[in-house]
Amino acid sequence: MPGPISNRPITTPTIGAPNVPPRSFDVSQVTAQELAKLKQSSPSLAKTIEQAKTTYAAELKAGARITVTTTAANGGAPVLTLVPPGFDPKKPATVQTHYHGDVTSVAAPNGSHTGNIKEQFARDPQRVFVLPEAQGNVGGTGTNWNNVRDQAGTVTDALAGAGVSPVEGSKYVVSAHSAGGRALAAAMKPPGTLKADQLVLLDCLYESTNGPGANTAILNAVKAGGLKNVSDVVIVATGSYPADRDAAMKSAGGDKVRMEKLVPRQGLSNHEASARNHLVPKPR
């Protein structure tokens, strides 16, 4: 979302609930009574389940499998997993981890990523979305992503909770929009551990107002081998930050990095359109 989206400095991730095993909830099966109990014990978990029930009501009715998992890999914060109707477990999948920006949440009904995900459900039943939530300021500005610890572990636990076991030939994507760049910066530590064949940077190369921010952290990770497992990096920029940041990323990432021209969308700012129209980039 627009605004001063990366004024929170990159810090050492907070380790949350390191010894608690993952828990998963099938959104369609959680009763009102269970939800009421969760609101007392795990408010953020309950809110994610409740929002997902409403936001994806039509998709659930059509046969989508939607789960919410808590895992130490995401610092104990909820992870929403979306398996489209018609998903075939015998065919290769594309598993996309997406870190959202400010003023939204993983299951926000009006989230710029939400609209694109709904479109992708109709286009590609083999694309599974894994949406880790932040630990603080969710839905506001200055989203607190200090909970991000292990993106690969988050994906493993989320897929297990959804009953998805990707077969040979499956691909992995990581995307970040806006303030989600801070989450990506944390996910790229240590460099080379990102579980991704493709990395999608959606207007997320911002700095902090009081020092280096996501852009510097991501660039340093790329220089240190952070694209070890990545073959394709797509940058979608809107001109809201200096263009030399894109150039620096292209220089560090070499031929793996390409720019995708922003496609505007009526009624949305270019910043929002970067996620609404480019969550799934065009093929290389």
Language model features: what each stretch is:
Residues M188-D197:
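Conserved hydrolase catalytic core segment
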Residues A176-A187:
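Glycine-rich nucleophile elbow surrounding the catalytic serine of serine-hydrolase chemistry
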Residues P13-V95:
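A domain-start/cap signature at the N-terminus of enzymes
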Residues L199-T209, A237-S240:
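Active-site nucleophile loop of the alpha/beta-hydrolase fold
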Residues D88-G161:
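Active-site machinery of serine-nucleophile hydrolases
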Residues V234-R284:
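C-terminal catalytic histidine-bearing segment of alpha/beta-hydrolase fold enzymes
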Residues P166-S178:
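Alpha/beta-hydrolase fold nucleophile elbow
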Residues E133, S175, L202-D203, V236:
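Alpha/beta-hydrolase-fold catalytic nucleophile elbow
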